[in-house]
Structure formats: structure tokens, C-alpha cells
A protein has these predicted regions:
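Peripheral (often C-terminal) accessory segments that flank ATP-dependent C-N-forming ligase machineries
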Residues: 222-313
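Conserved ATP-binding module of the ATP-grasp superfamily
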Residues: 57, 65-67, 79-82, 91-120, ...
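A short glycine-rich, hydrophobically flanked beta-strand micro-motif that places a catalytic Asp/Glu
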Residues: 181-192, 235, 313
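A conserved helix-loop-beta module that forms one wall/lid of the active-site cleft
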Residues: 36-99
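ATP-dependent carboxylate/phosphate-activation module, predominantly the ATP-grasp catalytic core
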Residues: 115-179, 201-227, 235-236
Length: 313
């Protein structure tokens, strides 16, 4: 299977490079590495916590605000949110207005629909305690990025304005109680009634770049130090920083370089990008959220123009 092939490729690379330890990146958290220290949460724990049904039950049992989650839509009132039980980035999430639009299949869960601003907290844990680095605004399904539905398309750090309730403190308590290590994230919806926990991510998050830019902290170094029982102090915010993922409106081939000082995750010329897949990320910094958002939108328009011209040639 695909998982076995990934394990093989990692083993081959480890054999060639011979590192002191391995840190697994997003999407590889449950990969198996033999004969070396792996500086991540244990794979079994990550797999368990990545299960959205397990998360909802755990949050409820431990007294944290949660979204009601069921293995079928029968016990919930419509409309319901339908999403994969395992998965990230808002892929496969949709709202079913009634039972005729449910399109139920194996591996899905149903949740009550909750409205609010999407936010996250970036946290470092040492297995017993935890320290929040920053609260972030999450960009979800923003049309100017080309993202559709509930697709994650970036963040702005810090979250402005901060909610009255201390989501950073709540995120620290969740990560500490779960006994998580290294870099973890807690996603929230900020509703009129207060914050609700959406999910816990036991991995490096998409906010890494904006957290580093806005605070000056080295998240990877903080991750490594946590395995020695060292937690950073909560950093001060120095500026606002944003990252947006730009999605392809149609399938096309990259004809020219998209490498600029403000782009990241850049595909090589000649790469084929399929419709609705990410093209690249854009970065911006400024003195406040409004400034950062305006710069991100300007850069997004420029990338759209370049890739539109590119795909028409």
C-alpha cells in the first residue's frame, strides 16, 4: 500500500543521510521509522487524536466546549456538517441541508452546524505542560484565494481582535491534558456564545510561517527543545503576518517562474497543476491585520494574472 511505500522511502533516505533523529512533517505523522529517535507524538496517539469522533468525545468528557459529533446524521437536526472522520484542511467538508443531500458513505461523520470566526492557537507541549505561541485567524474558503467550500487557505497572525475568552489558555490546557509533545495546534470557532473547539492537530500547522514572522520565535527549535522538557516563554507579537494558499481555477501547466520574495511552496516551470489543487503560498507582513490582508489580496491577484496568461498560451 501507499503507507508501506512511504515507510520504505523514509528508510532509504535515513540510510543515506544518517541523521541523529527524525522529525516527521505534516501528512507523515504515522509513518514508521526504524532504529532512530522520532521527535513527534507517538504514531498511535496521533492516529487516535486525529479521529474527529474520538476528539469530540474526549473534549466533552474533559469539560471543553465541543461540536456535537455522530457516526450518522440520524441523531442530529438538519442542516448538518458532513466531513471525513480522518482528514485535515477542510477537504471533503460540506453542509447537507436535508437527508436527500446527505450522500453518506463509509468513513464520514456528521456534526451540528456551528457558525463563527475560524481561529487557531499554536502550542508547544512537553508531554506534561504546554505553552501557547500565538492565536491566529484562519482563512477558510476565501474566494480571492480560489479556495472552495470549507478549504483551509491560510492564516493571519495574530488574531485581531482577540476574543474575551482566553483561547490561548484553553489550548494550553487541552494540549497538556492530552500529553502532547512538540508543535501542536488547536482549531476554534469563535461563536456569539463563546469559543468552541473544532479539532486538535498533533503536527506542524500551516500557521508556522506566520507565527515565526509575527513573533520572531523559531518554531522548529521550540519543537526540538520540548523533547528535552524545555518550553519557551510566550513570545511578544512584533508585527502582523499572513500566508495564503492560492488554488488553481482550472488545470494548467506552469510556463514561467513564480519565484518572488513573497512566494513559497513554488512549483517548477513545467509542473502540471490540476484544477482546485494548490498552486503556491503567498506571504505578507504589516503593522496590522488590514494591511496584511490587503497585501495578500494584491499578491493573489498578481499570481492569478500570471497563471491565467500562462494557461492561455
Amino acid at each position: 500500500g501507499g503507507a508501506d511505500r512511504i515507510d520504505e522511502l523514509i528508510s532509504e533516505h535515513v540510510e543515506r543521510v544518517r541523521p541523529d533523529a527524525v522529525v516527521l512533517g505534516p501528512g507523515l505523522e504515522v509513518a514508521r521509522v526504524k532504529g532512530l529517535p522520532v521527535l513527534n507524538n507517538p504514531a498511535e496517539k496521533t492516529a487516535r487524536i486525529s479521529d474527529k469522533l474520538y476528539q469530540a468525545r474526549w473534549l466533552e468528557k474533559n469539560g471543553f466546549p465541543f461540536i456535537r459529533t455522530e457516526t450518522s446524521a440520524e441523531d442530529l437536526n438538519f442542516p448538518v456538517m458532513v466531513k471525513p472522520r480522518q482528514g485535515a484542511g477542510g477537504v471533503g467538508c460540506r453542509i447537507a441541508e436535508d437527508s436527500s443531500r446527505l450522500e453518506w458513505e463509509e468513513g464520514l461523520i456528521a456534526q451540528e452546524v456551528v457558525s463563527g470566526q475560524a481561529a487557531s492557537v499554536s502550542v508547544i507541549g512537553d508531554g506534561k505542560d504546554a505553552r501557547a505561541l500565538a492565536a491566529n485567524e484562519q482563512l477558510i474558503g476565501e474566494s480571492w484565494t480560489g479556495a472552495k467550500g470549507f478549504r483551509y487557505c491560510g492564516n493571519i497572525t495574530p488574531l485581531e481582535p482577540l476574543p474575551k475568552s482566553d483561547i490561548a489558555n484553553m489550548a494550553e490546557r487541552i494540549v497538556a491534558r492530552l500529553g502532547l509533545l512538540g508543535s501542536n495546534g488547536v482549531d476554534f470557532l469563535l461563536t456569539e456564545e463563546g469559543p468552541v473547539v473544532v479539532e486538535v492537530n498533533c503536527r506542524f500547522q500551516g500557521s508556522l510561517d506566520t507565527v515565526e514572522c509575527a513573533t520572531g520565535i523559531n518554531v522548529f527549535e521550540a519543537h526540538l527543545n520540548s523533547f528535552r522538557g524545555l518550553l519557551p516563554s510566550r513570545p511578544a507579537i512584533k508585527c502582523s503576518a499572513g500566508r495564503a494558499i492560492i488554488y488553481a481555477p482550472r488545470s494548467f501547466e506552469i510556463k514561467e517562474s513564480l519565484l518572488f520574495p513573497w512566494t513559497a511552496d513554488v512549483p517548477r516551470p513545467g509542473s502540471r497543476i490540476e484544477r482546485d489543487d494548490p498552486i503556491l503560498s503567498i506571504m505578507a507582513k504589516g503593522s496590522n491585520r488590514g494591511e496584511v490582508l490587503a497585501r495578500l489580496k494584491d499578491s493573489a491577484a498578481m499570481i492569478r494574472e500570471l497563471t491565467t496568461c500562462s494557461s492561455r498560451r
